[in-house]
């Protein structure tokens, strides 16, 4: 039987599964550890998504601080986690059962702001009126 091919540009099932494993493990590690970095202490981190490369050797981790919606807060968190990535990668290697522990790349996640902006736009009375008149 032929293998099902993933369309170009989309992650494979293997990448998605590895990304979820890394996401769950990192969220647990970050919540459990005590960091000396003042940018990481007393901050609750949301790991929104992890995208793995096709060879699973690199992982882009999208993070946001809970309660700090500013772009500066997200950037500060991503920079702090980047400074701690050696420590986090070592801990991650002990937690997951992958052949290689991926290289971690932390990215400030702005998808929540984008979703809020779209939601606000859809709830605008003028847009709602247009949608209801078409339907």
Swiss-Prot record:
Family of this protein: Belongs to the RbfA family.
Name recorded for this polypeptide: Ribosome-binding factor A
GO biological process, one term: maturation of SSU-rRNA
Record's function text: One of several proteins that assist in the late maturation steps of the functional core of the 30S ribosomal subunit. Associates with free 30S ribosomal subunits (but not with 30S subunits that are part of 70S ribosomes or polysomes). Required for efficient processing of 16S rRNA. May interact with the 5'-terminal helix region of 16S rRNA.
GO cellular component terms listed in the entry, alphabetical order: cytosol
Organism whose genome encodes this protein: Hyphomonas neptunium (strain ATCC 15444)
Keyword vocabulary terms for this entry: Cytoplasm, Ribosome biogenesis
GO molecular function (one): ribosomal small subunit binding
Subcellular location: Cytoplasm
Quaternary structure (record): Monomer. Binds 30S ribosomal subunits, but not 50S ribosomal subunits or 70S ribosomes.
